[in-house]
Structures are given as C-alpha cells and as structure tokens.
Amino acid sequence: MVGRYRPSGYVLVSILLIRGSKKRCPDLKKEVKIENLFATPRGLAMSTVAGWDKVKGPVETAYTLPPSCYFSPDIYTSERKRIFSGGWVSFGRAEDLGNAGEYFASTVSDTPLVAVRGDDGEIRVFANTCRHRGMQLLSEGRGCVRQIACPFHGWGYALDGALTATPRMKSSIDFNKSDFGLIQISSAVREGFIFVNLDGAAGSVDDWLSGFSDLHQPWNLEALRTASQREFRVRCNWKLFLEVFNEYYHLKKVHPGTFGSLYRDPDPPEPVTGCFVSQFGEHVKKGSVGVLEKDHNELPLLPGLTGRLSNGTRYSWVYPNLSFAASRDALWMLEVTPIDPTETQVRMRLMFDADVMQSRGFAAKLATYEERMKIGMAEDIVVLEAQQIGVSSQFARQGRFCPELEPSVHAFQEWYAERMSAVS
C-alpha cells in the first residue's frame, strides 16, 4: 500500500467533537497548516529527549515510548545509525539462497545490500554498489546470476565479490582490480536467518542472540521451509507494526470473530541476555491457531514438540526487525524495513516442516492458513494506521503498559530507549 501524498508541512488532524447528548458526534477530518509542530529540534542529542528514563524499569511502573519516536524525522535518522547500522539486523533466510549464484537484494538503513551464495557454498553480503561510479548492481528482489554485472558500464564481479571484468580500463595508470572488489558487509547465518551489521562494530552475533538457539531448539527453525510469502506496505511506523504482533492485549477487541479467544494468557517473557524477547502461551483448545475454527483443516504437529509446547505458540521478537510466531504446526515470520518514519515495508512468510510440505493435500490446507493470516493482518492494519494518526497528534503523551499482556512490548521499548538515549 502506498501512503497518500500531502504537501510538506501539512498533517492530518482528526478531531472528535463530544458533548453531553445521545446524538452521535461526527468525526471531522481536515487538512491544516501547522509549522514545525512535531519536529524534534535539529541536532538535538538523543540523550536529551524527554521521556527516555520513564520507559526503563519494571513493566508495572514503566511508561511507553515518547510519541515522537513514531513520527519524528530526527529520531528516525538517529535510528538508522543506532538501531539499524549499529546492530545485527535480519536480512532474509538462507533457504532462499540454496544454489550458487542465487541472491536477495534489499535495503537496510536506506543502504542497498545484496546477499549471494558463492561457488564455495558460503553466503556473503555486499554493498549493492558498483566500485566504478556507484551504480546499483542488482534490482531489489531475488534472482540467480553467474556473476554480478554492472548494468551501467559492464564491470563484473565474481560471486565472492572479486572484480573480474573492467572493459576499456587498460590505459588507467596504477589501477589494480584487487583494490576494487565489492565491499563486504559483516554477516552471519543463525538458525536459518541471515543477519547483517552495517558498521561492523556490533560485536558477536552470538552475543546478540545469546540464548536464542537453545530456547527455540524444539522448533528446529533452520529446517523449516517457506511455503508462502508476500510483501506489502503499511502506513505506520515500523515499531508499531512489530509491537502489535507481540502483545495479547488487543486480541479480544481487534480479533473478536477470528482468533481473539484462542489463546490463554501467556507466560512471562523468558529471562534472556540476548537482544530479543520471547513469550510462550498455551492455546485454549487443543489444536492449531493457524486456521480459522470453521476450517478444521490443520497440519500435523511439528516434530520435536512435546508437553506444553505441543499445544501453544511462542512469540519472539529479535531486535530490531524480525518477529515470528512458532506454533505447534507452523511458523509465521515477519521482517520489516522502515520506508520513512510513518511507513513500513513488511515481508511475511508462512513456514512449515519440509516433509509436511510434500504431503498429499498440502496445497489445499496451506490455503486455509493463508486465509487466517490474511484476515488477521487486515484487522491489525486498520488499527495500526489509525494508531499512527493518533500517536502523531500534538496531544499524544506517554502511556502505561498492561503488565500481563504487554511485557514483550515493554522489553523492546526498554532496549530501544537504552540504545537511543546512550551518550555517543
């Protein structure tokens, strides 16, 4: 979805008129000129933004993030450095790059990158920029190449990034191909997920994911395979999108007729030291929450799940941009890329056991899982886009959490506040 165009300096203000009568009040929307109403002062250090300290501490006493975190261009600029360049960011799945030459091109922090499987079987991530004059080498998306060829002047690169072709460059003095290979980005593959670190200074990915593999071992994440995926845009800040996927508070209100009553209250978040949060919750009834109750067309239990894990779902959020729900029969994965402060690109996958995907009748059953996710996502998007309007108001203030049903959101916001408010 593409956001509606508005001239610079204009914002959409929703005004609700209320008076003491039984008549329904109109919802009036109009465009008004408001100069610099929501701006964070240029050059303001993030450590001085009011409200960070109120986010930190126990969920029972903590406040939510300052509303400006969801729309301020200056905070968004700081996020690009502190959150998306300075940490490990999810960048697709290794299963998409099964053969030599297969690649995935996208952006992180507005930086074009490409992940490619080499002839040696290794996955490497490069800046998607020609070393000649900066041309983007590969268009966003997936494909397969024997070599990476620049569409501008024909420079060519091997799958390991080495410069191999330089037409008409023989007369250049002191020009060595070995000095102009593609710039390699720090990357790692863990549990089938590809992670990248732009500034190369985030430390070990295993420290970032400390405890992640052990906690998710029963689901064998690396062995799961994608059966369905799609991309779409939502007119809300990237944090709002991932927050709603990691809290139970909205379920009965937003999803009353679909799956709002399928979950019991979740366990408290797991005590972890890595940069992620995870909660497990049992299902009210025995069976899948991946299909609507009317379908009764669920797939078999994932191998390795026993006891409580065989009838529940683990919601995990790997900071900053990867979240998934690992359930008894399937995994729903969401990976986000911020477009700007108020628009988000989402890559959504449905993943299953590889053997189950080869079973008879799988395609028909997959359709019921897709329908459930489609309906649920549509219900969420309605409130997310309305939340973006509300949180952008000059009257929006920091709120409070429901300790039992929003602790994962608080955990992320506390982590975010620590990184954003750190003195650099």
Predicted regions and their residues:
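Short, low-complexity, charge-dense intrinsically disordered segments
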Residues: 16-19
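C-terminal catalytic domain of Rieske-type non-heme iron oxygenases
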Residues: 116, 122, 128, 188, ...
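Rieske [2Fe-2S] iron-sulfur-binding domain
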Residues: 29-33, 96-200, 206-214
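Non-catalytic accessory segments flanking enzyme active sites
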Residues: 65-109, 113
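General detector of N-terminal leader/presequence modules that precede the first folded domain
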Residues: 31-56, 368-371
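Short, contiguous pre-domain boundary segments
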Residues: 52-67, 222
